[in-house]
UniProtKB/Swiss-Prot annotation:
Name used for this protein in its record: Polyphenol oxidase D, chloroplastic
Lineage of the species this protein comes from: Eukaryota, Viridiplantae, Streptophyta, Embryophyta, Tracheophyta
Pfam families: PPO1_DWL (PF12142), PPO1_KFDV (PF12143), Tyrosinase (PF00264)
UniProt record, GO biological process: pigment biosynthetic process
Subcellular location: Plastid, Chloroplast thylakoid lumen
Location (main, coarse): plastid
Length: 591
């Protein structure tokens, strides 16, 4: 088939590294429209030795997870609010990245800086006659594994011979460090691409350029990344192709106990669940159904809330929360454990944002995260991309496979086929895994359970707590349900954000519920939080957030649509003794 487009021209800018030379970009069938001029900001300049003025220090975003819901100040802000598009980072303001309040990253995560950022052009997709097709890692053959290992080997060689080359492996990993650990600032605030609507588009663009780089180094423009198919039982183990010692796809800082065919826990938060492999897989499929269907009926719930200039939000979408976060934790090592090389673990490369990209499995994991975006839209209903102009016009900065710097917009990454790649179709058993088995034979006697007014405020969640709560209305029509989602909200959850937090939520059960069996209709979701990254001198370690769960579908499945009062049970899983909750409410909300 003849190409339907011509090769696009590129603008080469001088950069501080030795060029590998450039090759023509392959032809692609799909092109986007013209792009707008970048939003210009003025940021703080850091001196060349990496030190920075701390007088304008601001809070890091809390790395919060919440299975099935959104929380934080964003819930009080309508999606139509004016937010201004997020501009690409000003590389001249790039500074040291932080691990926590007492540790800084020992090396610079900043990307090589072009001579003139104002002249960095917008990226145009190269023409292509054949889509790159990403395949599940557990189906990878020896030829593919060998090819990918050669590519990563060449990337790592560049780390030694041309350490500032942007397509070297370390420089590629540093992209995640800079965007996620406080190296970049915009308008005086740290840029963070997690916990908001930037999560999916940033990582899609990130993988796009990494994939192009990998293909360039092995002279294969059709090379496509594998994806860790953790949403399917056959992919619910650590990918074997990354677990071969002596290859560059292996990383010894991973959790050694999760090798050799161990079934992954997609809700893992540091504590091993004592159960069978079959039950774990069932739990995983339930989590996937809850995250992709029940708790993500509309864009706001799936993508996370908008990022507003000057306001720190902690409102990630469903998939970013779980399984994205737990897969990182499950793969990384436990802090303080001894690694095979005798070193003491700091949670492993994959367990930290700043170092996650140093483990090649990062790109395999995020390839499946990216796939979930496409699968979610294919589920139907209101599951469509965000149309807010400030999201569509937000920008990032990357280097392409020819070492040329570019600006990219969110609006240009909404269709993977237009970007030149697609995913090999795989069965998605979670679509039909709606948990219908009930833990309770009928409706729990709510008169025997304390009402919400007596249960709250809750001083500490150190044990399972049940309460009854009134609904705003009952027996809603299908039209009413389609117009508004019924939301269970926990207001003003407070805890020390330097530790791990998790609690699960169930409907229509009492505090004797088996919280290790998630494949029950009554399981609504989980609230989780990772340790917060603080800057030196910060004294406020208390987080205060709201947490929402969509419960319309659950009420139907449990048979509580016509009930005016329902029972809710909270089960602490991690750090419950330090959790307090002001109140709980049920309301109807536009989704």
């Amino acid at each position: 088939m003849a190409s339907l487009c011509s090769n696009s021209s590129t603008t080469s800018l001088k950069t501080p590294f030795t060029s590998l030379g450039s090759t023509p970009k392959p032809c692609q069938l799909f092109l986007h429209g013209k792009r707008n001029k970048a939003f210009k900001v003025s940021c703080k300049v850091t001196n060349t030795n990496g030190n920075q003025d701390e007088t304008n220090s601001v809070d890091r975003r809390n790395v919060l997870l919440g299975l099935g819901g959104l929380y934080g100040v964003a819930n009080a802000i309508p999606l139509a609010a004016s937010a201004a598009p997020t501009p690409p980072p000003d590389l001249s303001s790039c500074s040291i990245a932080r691990i926590d309040e007492n540790q800084v990253v020992s090396y610079s995560c900043c990307a090589p800086k072009p001579d003139d950022m104002e002249k960095v052009p917008y990226y145009k997709f190269p023409s292509m006659t054949k889509l790159r097709v990403r395949q599940p890692a557990h189906e990878a053959d020896e030829e593919y594994i060998a090819k990918y290992n050669v590519s990563v080997t060449k990337m790592r060689d560049l780390d030694k011979t041309q350490p500032l080359n942007p397509i070297g492996f370390k420089q590629q990993a540093n992209i995640h460090c800079a965007y996620c650990n406080g190296a970049y600032r915009i308008g005086g605030k740290e840029l963070q691409v997690h916990n908001s609507w930037l999560f999916f588009p940033f990582h899609r663009w990130y993988l796009y350029f990494y994939e192009s780089n990998a293909g360039k180094l092995i002279d294969d423009p059709t090379f496509a990344l594998p994806y860790w198919n953790w949403d399917h039982p056959k992919g619910m183990r650590f990918p074997a192709m990354y677990d071969r010692e002596g290859t560059f796809l292996f990383d010894e800082t991973r959790d050694q106990s999760h090798r050799n065919g161990t079934v992954i826990d997609l809700g893992f938060f540091g504590n091993e669940v004592e159960t069978t492999q079959l039950q774990m897989m069932s739990n995983n499929l339930t989590l996937m159904y809850r995250q992709m269907v029940t708790n993500a009926p509309c864009p706001r719930m799936f993508f996370g809330d908008l990022m507003i200039s000057g306001i720190t939000l902690n409102s990630p979408g469903t998939i970013e929360n779980i399984p994205h976060g737990p897969v990182h934790i499950w793969s990384g090592t436990v802090r303080g454990s001894t690694l095979p090389n005798g070193a003491i673990s700091k949670r492993g490369e994959y367990g930290h944002f700043y170092s996650a990209g140093l483990d090649p499995v990062f790109f395999c994991h995020h390839s499946n995260v990216d796939r979930m975006w496409s699968e979610w839209k294919a589920t139907g209903g209101k599951r469509t991309d965000i149309t807010h102009k400030d999201w569509l016009n937000s920008e990032f900065f990357f280097y392409d496979e020819n070492e040329n710097p570019y600006r990219v917009k969110v609006r240009d990454c909404l269709d993977t086929k237009k970007m030149g790649y697609d995913y090999k179709p795989m069965r998605t058993p979670w679509r039909n895994f709606k948990p219908l088995t009930k833990a309770s034979a009928g409706k729990v006697n709510t008169s025997s359970i304390p009402p919400v007014s007596q249960a709250f405020p809750l001083a500490k969640l150190d044990k399972a707590v049940s309460f009854s709560i009134n609904r705003p209305t009952s027996s809603r029509t299908p039209q009413e349900k389609n117009a508004q989602e019924e939301m269970l909200t926990f207001n003003s959850i407070r805890y020390d954000n330097r530790g791990y937090i998790r609690f699960d939520v169930f409907l229509n059960v009492d505090n004797n519920v088996n919280a290790n069996e998630l494949d029950k209709a009554e399981f609504a979701g989980s609230y989780t939080s990772l340790p917060h990254v603080h800057r030196a001198g910060e004294t406020n370690h208390i987080a205060t957030v709201d947490f929402q769960l969509a419960i319309t579908e659950l009420l139907e499945d449990i048979g509580l649509e016509d009930e005016d009062t329902i029972a809710v049970t909270l089960v602490p899983k991690r750090g419950g003794e330090g959790i307090s909750i002001e109140n709980a409410t049920i309301s109807l909300a536009d989704c």
